[in-house]
Amino acid sequence: MRHLPLFMCTAFCGLYSSQTEAADKKNERPNILWLTFEDTSAYEFGCYGNGDVHTPNADSLAARGIQFMNAWSVAPQSSAARSSLITGCYSSTYGMDIHPVPYDTPADIFFPQRLREAGYYCTNNSKTHYNSTTDNKSCWDECNNKASYNSTKRGKDQPFFAVYNTVTSHMGRIRTFHTDGRRDYTQEGIFPQQLTLPSYVPDLPEVRSDYAGHLEAVQDVDTWLGIFLKDLETRGLEDNTIIFFFSDHGGCVARGKGYLYESGLKVPMIAYFPPKWRHLANGAKGKENGLVNFTDLGPTVLSLAGVKPPKNMQGKALYGKFASKEKREVQFALAANQLHHFMPVRAVTDGRFKYIRSYIPYRQFALRNYYQWGMPSNKAWDKLVLGGHNTNPDWKQTFEPHPAEMLFDLEKDPDELHDLSAIPEYAETLYKMRQALSDHIRTTHDLGFFLPNSRTGHILYEKVRKEKYPLDELYGLVEIAGTATVASLPMLEKAIASPLPVMRFWGVVGYANLARENQINTCPQALLALLQDENPYIASEAAYAVVYLGKAQEGIARLITPAQEKDRKIGYSSLECLSLDPEMRDYIRPFLSELKEAAENLPRLENEDAGLMARGILVNLGEMDIKDLHGPEAYKKGLKLNYGRRAMVPLPN
């Protein structure tokens, strides 16, 4: 494919200087275009080393622009990631981390409004997905499927900030429940049997098919990029438009989206500065190995527009008038939940080493997000492990409880399979990473440890400040809970007696961790009493704990029959966790009739339905085949998706 004039590089410094001076004299400001796509890891593009895919437009853009080699999304799920993009802050600071649930937040935290006040015309076509009840469209001049930088409402010389998001690579493209009727990807130059699979996924036909289908989507994204580059050229905008091209988080190969591994966090990100505006990036070009994350993009856009980023923004401007001179030493990421499974996890990296902290470590990573488990590869992986056919310990890791702390050497172990946290020679690195994360959750006032049902009816960000909430005490408890020892019992005993629900919950997590690890074997009466706690999250977590303390009948009965029907899914979350433990399955079997009734009679067509969760538990118990998880209704839907192909939209109107 020929290179478009947009990418022509000047060979003369004099021309570069004259263009810079001309821009300064006219007091011009650049247009800024974000072209975003979904669910795609960095390794899925040719310019990031993938030889199985054809991405000429992105490869060309990377060669002529700035290719970020260590760019992280803040979160491995869409809404939490986009909440960070739009605010320039970690989404946990505003309690916007739970996917995909909007909560009340301060109303003035979306940065495009500042651009509008500075004279920019701001458009979004059209996905928002910010986890805020504030009108997501309020910060844009236009926010719909017709919004365009070509709008007749934009002034003749008015600079624009335009965002286009395509869903062509979204997981929904391969969330087809089965592979029957799938297109022949070899017609697109993608050969499933020749693909190089990541070592953390099993080599199964469904895994290869899903990966091939997603690489087809990546090629479509590349074509979509080319359409915009041509439009900018045709309209004479290429010389005045800075482009950012990136994914919202990692991709659709299993153990990617939703997980704080590199496969879920490291995104392809390319920035292109036309010669006229290259001085704003200090002439930078080529591969950038520094650490970058989504909190940096909002401040960067403001800085490029000549607007000083507000002090409350936690990211750093990479380029422009207010570019930060500080080098980022470490960067952070977060995950809050897998659908109904509340399981906060945090991560930090210095580029070489990666630390993942699971605050409820007995919650397996394989707990199902029932949307993601519509991918045939996830179903096939479940069948391999749960059916007892797996012989590779690496492929079983996500099905088991994991250490509260994990440490990986990304240089030697890019697939993050070999945990170094227990190896003495890495003790100093482990300590440094642990301390960096501990400091981070405190300096950012991380609200992600508050229960989902405690975030409604108020603006949590303001409530904790107004009431001088004991956040430091909470963080200390949270850190102890996942690594509790018998020496922690006095703190845990105090916590479960607290009038504050969040303290009771994390106290229970500490007891559950001790019980799961066989560090205690008798059930305290105060813990047993929490089966009747008015907060269903506390009652369900207590029920999980007492099952391991000789009270299986009482605990499982509480999980099977909630105090209120609306809380059933919370109990099923803990029950699913138990059902992945082979030693606990016989304790659940006396309740099979109740589970089968729920699986048959409760709603099961939507990802959040309790009937679907009941079916998942039955699968774990060996009482249902994984292929029947979503029911017969899903088969026809899958056929239609396998025959079809997502459109490359939106386009520059």
Go through the PLM ranges and name each one.
Residues R2, M8, F12-G14, S18-N390, ...:
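Formylglycine-dependent sulfatase
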Residues A23-P30, F37, A42, Q67, ...:
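Long, internal low-complexity/basic segments
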